[in-house]
Swiss-Prot record:
GO terms for molecular function: nutrient reservoir activity. The keyword Secreted applies. This is Hexamerin 70a. It is found in: Secreted; Nucleus; Cytoplasm; Cytoplasmic granule. Induction: In 5th instar larvae induced by juvenile hormone. In adult workers induced by a protein-rich diet.
Amino acid sequence: MFIPSHQVWLVGLLAFSLVGAEYYDTKTADKDFLLKQKKVYNLLYRVAQPALANITWYNEGQAWNIEANIDSYTNAAAVKEFLSIYKHGMLPRGELFSLYYPQLLREMSALFKLFYHAKDFDIFFKTALWAKNNINEAQYIYSLYTAVITRPDTKFIQLPPLYEMCPYFFFNSEVLQKANHALIFGKLDTKTSGKYKEYIIPANYSGWYLNHDYNLENKLIYFIEDIGLNTYYFFLRQAFPFWLPSKEYDLPDYRGEEYLYSHKLLLNRYYLERLSNDLPHLEEFDWQKPFYPGYYPTMTYSNGLPFPQRPIWSNFPIYKYKYIREIMNKESRISAAIDSGYILNNDGKWHNIYSEKGLNILGNIIEGNADSYNTEFYGSIDTLARKILGYNLEAASKYQIVPSALEIFSTSMKDPAFYRIYKRIIDYYHSYKMHQKPYNKDEIIYPNLKIESFTVDKLITYFEQFDTTINNGLLLEEQRNDDKPFLIKIRQYRLNHKPFNFHITINADKPMKAAIRIFIGPKYDSHHKLIEIPEDLKYFYEIDNWMLDLNSGLNKITRNSLDCFFTMNDLEPSEIFYEKIETSLNSDKPFTYNERIFGFPGRLLLPRGKKEGMPFQLFLYVSPVSSEYNQYNSRIWGGYKFDKRSFGFPLDKPLYDFNYEGPNMLFKDILIYHKDEFDMNITY
């Protein structure tokens, strides 16, 4: 099935110094890890057809009695809660699921707790086998993903690519129609690759048939519908499930701050892609006026229901008015909290948010997560905005729902409304930062560090073909033993870039540990007007951040684009990854894995640019690191060391009357070239 490409965080040994960077550990799996890895993949194989997936395990699941084995779980109350819900009826198999419906969330949460509190992996596996047979497929997949990410005994166990598990969230309905009929009608061209027969289906993105003159947002369809980007967003929200209390499940205490900053990075990356397509800043919107961007998905759910659409410049439906009244009240309370500096907690006491943990508190109440100081008073403007802008009808009953794209994490970023929601939310972030005391020059200028030079290789982007195997997400007949195994693959073009290096020379007056940050931002706006500094620094996007040891004198550093701290390469297809597991189990061949399970798609590090070269600028910042630093640990992103400064430093609080000119900081003009496919064989 798949394995992430090895990313070594290494800065080269060059002329004047040895420069060491922090890196993600790579481990060699022992047999226990391999067996767990194999079983997890089998738990997520053909979830809609468990008896066809493995009849032995299907029978084992049916034989497992949770109530009779209540002592096999570490939390009897959680088991009783689940059994009570199950006996009163849960979401039937085949029905649609979304976290944004309280009853469905309650059921899924109870199932997750059942998985989480299994006393060992064997009990967890048996419980999951039972649930695979009896629980709604989407509830099962989501709760199992969350449990594997959270349980102590499944740390860094890889999960199947979500776009293989749930292709209906990633590909157009006409493509999946062909996939479902590929074997029945035999109309698709096939090819033989190794031991498999492959069916290749070319695919467009949604809206390929629309007139772009009237729907300019469609220029960005290759970006907002990228399967790697949408899978990244799913895992971003899995890092801190909004319904999960941090203390109860030992989650880090910066979830609110990470929620805000990670969405700020996504928004800035999106903005750079807008510039590459000559689109302006996002417009403001009013809850009492028509909403500009339309959304016309050509996707259907696995049960055949279409994703809801939203016409361009449409008035809000009457059945959304109750949510509009509520969100306007909640937004006014959050604005008042930022302006006053105080929020009201559950005990009716005022709490100062201009404190060390203040931004984290603010992020929690905006998201409305389980750590919010006062969910009743501040609600969740994140959830309410999705409810309103999704334009889906109200549920006919608690189990008859048609979620909008905004109510499914892996489809949220496809809707242009997503970016309007988070522009509004990130405006609160900027407002909070502007209310804080700005940095003084002594906090960001370090004369003992001087950047002598900063260059970067030629930056070239292009579109490439990518094949996705989707067998696991389709209903398929049992294959005859004499048939050659077949794979159904969807082929799409995706944005990528040629690898490149940053070349940095730093002069240090003494040996020290330092932190290097690299940001990319616009040079001009969509009207070709030079951006303003520091006002427009809020649009800069952090692409790298690492610590290293500097020697006294000149230090020459080379940093490759593959090393950027939060990126990773594409995942291997499931059939390849699974074969590696079995090979290692049946031989002496080692199986290695990274201590992380996902990252931002490295392909999308750079905006598309233009054929003639599009101007952007890099901002390089170097600062000393004290003996103390932050050890960032994530079950999804891995472990990494950062200095103790805030996310986005030093651009998070712009310093006015200062052009960010100093010995330890530097702006660098760059051009990003986009090459057509037929140009890629030409040497430049």
